[in-house]
Amino acid sequence: MASIDPYQHIIVEHQYSHRFTVTVIKATNVTKGTFGDMLDTPDPYVELYISSAPDSRKRTKHFNNNINPVWNETFEFILDPNQDNVLEITLMDANYVMDESLGTTTFPISSVKPGEKKQVPFTFNKVTEMILEFLLEVCSSTDLRFSMALCDQEKFFRQKRKNQVINGLRKLLGPEKTKDLNPTSRDVPVIAVLGSGGGFRAMIGFSGVMKALFESGVLDCVTYIAGLSGSTWYMSALYSHADFPNKGPKEINKELMNNVSHNPLLLLTPQKVKRYIEALWKKKSSGQPVTFTDIFAMLIGETLIKDRMNRKLSHMQEKISHGQCPLPLFTCLHVKPDVSELMFADWVEFSPYEIGMAKYGTFMPPDHFGSKFFMGTVIKKYEENPLHFLMGVWGSAFSILINRVLGVSTNNQGSTMEEEIENLKPKHILGNDSSDSDDEMQEPKGTENSKAEEEYQRNNQASWVQRMLMALLGDSALFNTREGRAGKVHNFMLGLNLNTSYPYSPLSGLCTQQSMEEDEFDAAVADPDEFEQIYEPLDVKSKKIHIVDSGLTFNLPYPLILRPQRGVDLIISFDFSARPSDSSPPFKELLLAEKWARMNKLPFPKIDPHVFDREGLKECYIFKPKNPSVEKDCPTVIHFVLANLQFRNFKAPGVPRETAEEKEFADFDIFDDPETPFSTFNFQYPNEAFKRLHDLMEFNTLNNINVIKQAMVESIEYRKQHPSRCSVSLNDVEARKLLHKDSQSKFQM
């Protein structure tokens, strides 16, 4: 049964590409013509060009003064067999000033049959003969995984983690309430912790949360930790730390406090800027897109993980290989240049095992993200992106608004990050750069020879470095227009077929019509056009895609946890989002998450915003399914908000503050303080501000441990009554007609 994938072929129509291999063997009697040969002996090389191929141009090396060159160089092209693919072959002569074409011919690739290898002679100028060898193969496997199911590594992790969770639940809840739990039972609840965005405020708040969860034993019962923007920065710092989990958050948080106490402008010394620019130029010249997000990523990395800038997302596998820690999940959005993020956004999820988009069922190993793809096959592989680059992408709202981060004054600043973002147009974030342009420093016909090109590249690099330096120092339109700040990577879905777009969930019937009507499905939470185009597909013709901070649509990473395949029973979410004041209702982001879930047919408890009117501001709120027997797959949500309530009077749960110093330390507002020490744009935290925010969220979490424990007990009882939480029959799978008949029969066995 493990080999059957019930979701394969549901979203992306799986099609096969062709690998076309060309070997340029040799040429004889290369000539420039009678008069040309009298002046100079040819220095020949060959250019290959297929306009329909994504990596369209290749060339051999050149030989000096050789009329009978032997190259024996082999090149590969990935092709769409449904297109009219034609190979253009050009014989070139390398010159000091300008290379010269000695002739061009074409070859229809359709004349080669799949599996066939053959040599073909070509004639140039009636006397020159060139021999090429062709091989056409069907790419029967791809570098993308097409599926809605979890990858094998995550399934293996879940089984390993299940043993840890059982032990954690027994320690936390006692033997009586966990006596029936065992590794083979299906009544072990899946628990997830969520952290919102909110800059360093979210990162520091989440550090206090994680310390409380770690030391209380709750973290031992958790299967997933999902973060967005600022929370991902803490998760990155924690999971990339060499001593975690042997060293707990308490010690690691002290290091973090020291790191964020310095002014971020100290990272812009000439020596460091030079190092940043050199790294960015190296990336750009290799053919990868570079935007201001890359610069911000280096700044955030130098601040938070400066001693491990070479760490990568895949390195976190060692922290979870035996289920010893919860699986960390990170997120960003794929957005379109001409559409608001609230209207259209695809959620991209990152784990140490895979990166992909569940909406389309397309996933890849972390070391493939950023590489060039065509029809699911890697056509140009790059090194895995460093973790700090991903941190910059996950929190890229701050690279978009970096003038606020660095304290550069402008004439048009909103008072909050939300106001700033509302003033942004997609074209301001993404700029006018065409996502279909190639970044490689290619040599079109007639370019200068290698020495002349080296000089050109040096001048080009110097000019580019100068522009980026000017941008960093603030004397640039980048700071005023915010253009070109979104992250950008090669489109890993280039060339795929998306004939039909489906909702996020492959399951039907998860929400009853009655509940949909009761929930006022179409009611606007933040904007009349919110989520209007979420069913629209990605543009599979664009060579690059823009990726931005997920907080630009809503500020909680629920889409990662609500995937039906993860079957999460209990969600403990921590919202550090900005509010107009400390007394403002704290449910905006949660309501957006609820609406998104309903629109994607995912079970979610009814969020009643009027609970704030009835009960006032609290440290946490609980939302459960109204009718568990009907909403049988609906998780329970414990929603913590950023509020300084009992912390003012208690230094630990049940331990009153006594001294004036203790009371003064806890007497602070978060959003009402006119000095705005906890602003979303504050990237420098003195030790006292750090401790206040850290200790507040640690206290709030510990103060509600009994609420969490009770929800765990209820989740265990619920699992006993409904053990097959994520059981799926073939009749529940939308678009099951796309499944092959043999797959259907195997799945139904």
UniProtKB/Swiss-Prot annotation:
GO MF terms, alphabetically ordered: calcium ion binding; lysophospholipase activity; phospholipase A2 activity
Binding residues annotated for Ca(2+) 1, in chain numbering: 40-41, 43, 65
Record flagged with keyword Magnesium: no
The reaction(s) this protein catalyses: a 1,2-diacyl-sn-glycero-3-phosphocholine + H2O = a 1-acyl-sn-glycero-3-phosphocholine + a fatty acid + H(+); a 1-acyl-sn-glycero-3-phosphocholine + H2O = sn-glycerol 3-phosphocholine + a fatty acid + H(+)
InterPro entries reported for this sequence: Acyl_Trfase/lysoPLipase, C2_cPLA2, C2_dom, C2_domain_sf, LysoPLipase_cat_dom
SMART domains in the cross-refs: C2, PLAc
TM stretches of this protein: none
Ranges for region Phospholipid binding: 1-178
One Pfam family hit: C2
Start-end of Basic and acidic residues biased regions: 442-457
EC numbers: 3.1.1.4, 3.1.1.5
Gene Ontology annotations of biological process type: phospholipid catabolic process
Keywords associated with the record: Calcium, Cytoplasm, Cytoplasmic vesicle, Hydrolase, Lipid degradation, Lipid metabolism, Metal-binding
A single Gene Ontology CC term: cytoplasmic vesicle
Domain PLA2c: from-to ranges: 138-740
Protein localization: Cytoplasm; Cytoplasmic vesicle
Coiled-coil regions, chain positions: none
Gene3D superfamilies on file: C2 domain, Cytosolic phospholipase A2 catalytic domain
Annotated catalytic residues: 229, 549
Residues covered by region (Disordered): 417-458
Activity regulation description: Stimulated by agonists such as ATP, EGF, thrombin and bradykinin as well as by cytosolic Ca(2+).
Function: Selectively hydrolyzes arachidonyl phospholipids in the sn-2 position releasing arachidonic acid. Together with its lysophospholipid activity, it is implicated in the initiation of the inflammatory response.
UniProt comment concerning the protein's domains: The N-terminal C2 domain associates with lipid membranes upon calcium binding. It modulates enzyme activity by presenting the active site to its substrate in response to elevations of cytosolic Ca(2+).
Protein name, entry field: Cytosolic phospholipase A2
Taxonomic lineage: Eukaryota, Metazoa, Chordata, Craniata, Vertebrata
